[in-house]
C-alpha cells in the first residue's frame, strides 16, 4: 500500500490539490480542506462555468448546467414570491426526479433549509 499512501500524501499534503489543514471551529480543532468552498451555495455557483455541459440525464431528457441554473433561479424567485426565505424550511417529498435536485439547489442557494422526505410516506407520516 505504499503507492496509496504516497498518492494520499501528494493529494492531501502541503500544496496538494486537496490539502488538509487543522482549523478552529468554535474552539474545537477540526481537519478541513484548505481550498474548500465556504458553503453549498458557492458549490452550486461554481458550476456556472460548465454552462453548456450536460448536468442531468433522465431518460431521453438532458439538461445543461445553464438550463439547470435558469430553472433553479426561477424556482428561487417563485419561493421568494411565496414569502419563503432565509431560515425557512421547505419539505421535498418527491421521487428521484431531476426536479428534486433543482428544488434542493434553489433552497440551499438562498438560505432555505431543504428537508428531504420519503415520497412513499403516508400523509400522517409526513405530518409527523
Language model features with spans:
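Short, contiguous pre-domain boundary segments
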Residues: 21-31
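A short N-terminal helical cap/helix-turn-helix that marks the beginning
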Residues: 3-16, 34-55, 70, 74
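Structured binding elements
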Residues: 111
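AMP-binding adenylation
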Residues: 1-4, 21
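Conserved AMP-binding/adenylate-forming core of the ANL superfamily
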Residues: 35, 52-108, 122-127
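Short beta->alpha connector loops at strand-helix junctions that form conserved
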Residues: 117-119
Amino acid at each position: 500500500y505504499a503507492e496509496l499512501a504516497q498518492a494520499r500524501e501528494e493529494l492531501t499534503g502541503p500544496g496538494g490539490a486537496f490539502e488538509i489543514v487543522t482549523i478552529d471551529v468554535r474552539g474545537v480543532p477540526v481537519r478541513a480542506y484548505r481550498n474548500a468552498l465556504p458553503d453549498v451555495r458557492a458549490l452550486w455557483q461554481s458550476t456556472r462555468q460548465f454552462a453548456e455541459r450536460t448536468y442531468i440525464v433522465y431518460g431521453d431528457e438532458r439538461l445543461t448546467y445553464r438550463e439547470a441554473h435558469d430553472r433553479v433561479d426561477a424556482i428561487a424567485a417563485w419561493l421568494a414570491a411565496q414569502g419563503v426565505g432565509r431560515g425557512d424550511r421547505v419539505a421535498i417529498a418527491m421521487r428521484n426526479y431531476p426536479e428534486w435536485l433543482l428544488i434542493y439547489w434553489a433552497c440551499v442557494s438562498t438560505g432555505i433549509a431543504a428537508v428531504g422526505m420519503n415520497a412513499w410516506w403516508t400523509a400522517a407520516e409526513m405530518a409527523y
